[in-house]
Regions:
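N-terminal subdomain of nucleotide-sugar transferases
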Residues: 1-80, 85, 218, 227, ...
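A conserved catalytic-core segment of Leloir-type glycosyltransferases
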Residues: 42-134, 138
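Short N-terminal targeting/anchoring amphipathic segment
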Residues: 92-99, 144-165, 177-181
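Membrane-proximal helix-turn-helix segments that form the acceptor-binding/catalytic region
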Residues: 142-145, 164-167, 171-175, 200-219
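Nucleotide-sugar donor phosphate/pyrophosphate-binding loop at the beta->alpha transition
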Residues: 176-181, 190-211, 251
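A short, active-site helix/loop in glycosyltransferases that binds the activated sugar's phosphate group
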Residues: 211-241
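Carbohydrate-associated surface elements
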Residues: 225, 245-248
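Conserved catalytic-core segment of nucleotide-activated headgroup transferases in glycan assembly
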Residues: 250-299
């Protein structure tokens, strides 16, 4: 088997946000270990800021961009040549001309709240199904088949969320026979924030998850806890092809041993959600104020 692997994700540099870095660093270090990653991503970024310097770390990796139109009024307006209202464009404009007053924004948002609620209702239940990347699927499958043929791909790798990534991987596997590795960065239909609260949409998302476990040649999870969750959900049927691959620290960012500080730090990495409230902080404060702290592991 050759070492040509197709990495499929809508989240890749120059985008810079939490969902980017698992696939991004995987690509970087696969290349160093003798693999030949080829990336398939989106050609438009509507929601995230960008850092073009990130691409310097994967300069020699082929990156293909399949056509993606956001299924929103914004996506339609931009497609028809309207103003670029992506987050990166708005942020750049704000830096140039200055942000508007908060009072003006508040009045505007109040006036639009009724329409906004109706608009979101339509999007969540009828348009963005199974998610907002639904209109990326067709072009990604078409381009993916071409890449598989031209680069003699031996493995397809997708990372979820979004659910659409799994649909793309599944279709490419069925169309080409190439082995498919389905990665889960989140416990999808188990975690409330990850799936739709509208049952017909949730049912479609659940079906995608079920088919993923059924047809993927291997399942990988960001956390060992996720694999335990999936093992319980599917009664152990897929445990023989499920693997835990943690998201590690990029060694290039670590200081040399000689330059490391002697002090130890406790660092929280990730999102601290509103739902967490202050439970962790209370426990942490008690631990810090206790008479003894024990450390375990490598420092």
């Amino acid at each position: 088997m050759n070492k040509n692997i197709l990495i499929i994700t809508p989240f890749f540099p120059p985008q810079t946000h939490a969902a980017v870095f698992r696939a991004f660093k995987l690509v970087k270090y696969l290349k160093r270990t003798g693999w030949n990653p080829i990336v398939l991503t989106v050609n438009r970024n509507y929601l995230y800021l960008e850092d073009p310097d990130l691409l310097d770390e994967v300069q020699d990796v082929p990156i293909y961009q399949a056509n993606y139109i956001e299924p929103t009024l914004r996506g339609l307006r931009m497609l028809l040549g309207g103003e670029d209202t992506s987050l990166k464009a708005i942020t750049a404009k704000a830096k140039t001309i200055g942000a508007q007053s908060k009072s003006t924004d508040t009045v505007t948002s109040n006036k639009q709240s009724l329409f906004g609620k109706f608009y979101k209702y339509i999007l969540d239940r009828w348009i963005q199904v199974p998610d907002r990347f639904r209109f990326w699927e067709r072009s990604a499958v078409r381009m993916g088949r071409k890449i598989i043929k031209e680069h003699d791909i031996s493995i397809i790798y997708t990372t979820c969320l979004p659910f659409t990534s799994n649909r793309i991987g599944m279709r490419l596997k069925h169309l080409t026979g190439v082995k498919w590795v389905a990665d889960f960065r989140d416990p999808t239909t188990y975690a409330k924030r990850m799936y739709s609260d509208y049952f017909p949409v949730f049912a479609k998302q659940k079906k995608i998850e079920q088919d993923t476990f059924k047809y993927a040649d291997a399942i990988t999870g960001l956390s060992g806890a996720y694999l335990n969750i999936f093992n319980d959900l599917y009664e152990g049927r897929y445990s023989n092809k499920s693997y835990f691959i943690p998201t590690g620290v990029d060694d290039d960012y670590l200081p040399s041993f000689q330059n490391r500080e002697k002090e130890n730090y406790i660092i929280f990495v990730g999102e601290y959600l509103h739902e967490y409230k202050d439970n962790f902080l209370k426990i942490f404060a008690e631990a810090v104020n206790s008479k003894e702290l024990k450390g375990k592991g490598c420092t």
